[in-house]
């Protein structure tokens, strides 16, 4: 500090005196991973994590997705919430599986990668499940398969449609064959729904790959995808290395799959609630959801 600064009253600050740093609450601002725009967190959350500048669909947590689908205060019944993963194989790679489970549970706040709930959509009963990619990349293990199967059974008991939002890297390798068995279990559960004449709508979000895409994610009576979602079994880089050819532009993206008849339609996340309400009402031969709301 200079001799002049010492003589100046304490209330006067010189140019060299550092100003107090104002702390910005964490998560108040986010950056769009597509266009790079700075986005105000609360507004982005209200917009269902879709960038208002470029319409890029960013990652959204499972509970936020389900809350945006169900009627307010109706999704009070969570299905098989008490189930948690078990390290039956005592698997260890760079880290023990048990340690990975604890770390993922702490980071995500969830017991496992799939959340299933029962509620209503525009007055009509509905069962829905959603993957949380924040939990071990949305990988499918025994708990995911069991929760999915139980959700399908609840839909069967209630006699209502079942909707699942997929976002997964595939089967969870740390559970070995226990994980692969879930492909058959979930597909069999959907078979029972189909026999009962109850609709299943599969919503494929970014990314939907591996064993999830090879089982229930592609078994919907109607398969809907979010814009520009990566959907496929193996990733494009793996395929290029295997076939030693350059893949077409946009390969495995939802727009490419729609053009080639792999999925039925693409829907913006902000319109997804209305779209699913219309489709389920039509398939269940119920009144138009807007008419039901008006009544």
Curated annotation (Swiss-Prot):
Binds 1 zinc ion per subunit. The keyword ATP-binding applies. Zn(2+) binds at residues 32, 35, 51, 54. GO terms for molecular function: acetyl-CoA carboxylase activity; ATP binding; carboxyl- or carbamoyltransferase activity; zinc ion binding. The keyword Protein biosynthesis does not apply. Disulfide bonds: none annotated. A zinc finger (C4-type) spans 32-54. GO terms for cellular component: acetate CoA-transferase complex. It catalyses: N(6)-carboxybiotinyl-L-lysyl-[protein] + acetyl-CoA = N(6)-biotinyl-L-lysyl-[protein] + malonyl-CoA. Component of the acetyl coenzyme A carboxylase (ACC) complex. Biotin carboxylase (BC) catalyzes the carboxylation of biotin on its carrier protein (BCCP) and then the CO(2) group is transferred by the transcarboxylase to acetyl-CoA to form malonyl-CoA. This is Acetyl-coenzyme A carboxylase carboxyl transferase subunit beta.
């Amino acid at each position: 500090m200079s001799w002049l600064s010492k003589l100046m009253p304490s209330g006067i600050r010189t140019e060299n005196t550092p100003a107090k740093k104002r702390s910005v609450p964490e998560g108040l601002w986010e950056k769009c991973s597509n266009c790079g725009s700075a986005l105000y967190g609360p507004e982005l959350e209200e917009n269902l994590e879709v960038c208002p500048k470029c319409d890029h669909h960013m990652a959204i947590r499972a509970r936020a997705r389900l809350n945006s689908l169900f009627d307010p205060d109706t999704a009070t019944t969570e299905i098989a919430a008490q189930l948690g993963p078990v390290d039956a194989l005592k698997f260890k790679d760079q880290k023990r599986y048990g340690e990975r489970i604890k770390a993922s549970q702490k980071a995500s706040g969830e017991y496992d990668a799939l959340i299933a709930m029962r509620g209503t959509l525009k007055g009509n009963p509905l069962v829905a499940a959603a993957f949380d990619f924040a939990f071990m990349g949305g990988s499918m293990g025994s708990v995911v398969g069991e929760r999915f199967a139980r959700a399908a059974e609840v839909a069967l008991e209630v006699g209502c449609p079942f909707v699942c939002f997929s976002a997964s890297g595939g089967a969870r390798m740390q559970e070995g064959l226990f994980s692969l068995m879930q492909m058959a279990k979930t597909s069999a559960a959907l078979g029972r729904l189909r026999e009962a004449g109850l609709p299943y709508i599969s919503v494929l979000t970014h990314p939907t790959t591996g064993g999830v895409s090879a089982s229930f994610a592609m078994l919907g009576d109607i398969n809907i995808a979010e814009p520009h979602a990566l959907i496929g079994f193996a990733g494009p880089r793996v395929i290029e290395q295997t076939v030693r050819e350059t893949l077409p532009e946009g390969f495995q993206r939802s727009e490419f799959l729609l053009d080639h008849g792999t999925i039925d339609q693409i829907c913006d996340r902000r319109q997804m609630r209305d779209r699913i309400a219309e489709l389920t009402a039509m398939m269940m031969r119920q009144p138009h959801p807007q008419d039901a709301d008006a009544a």
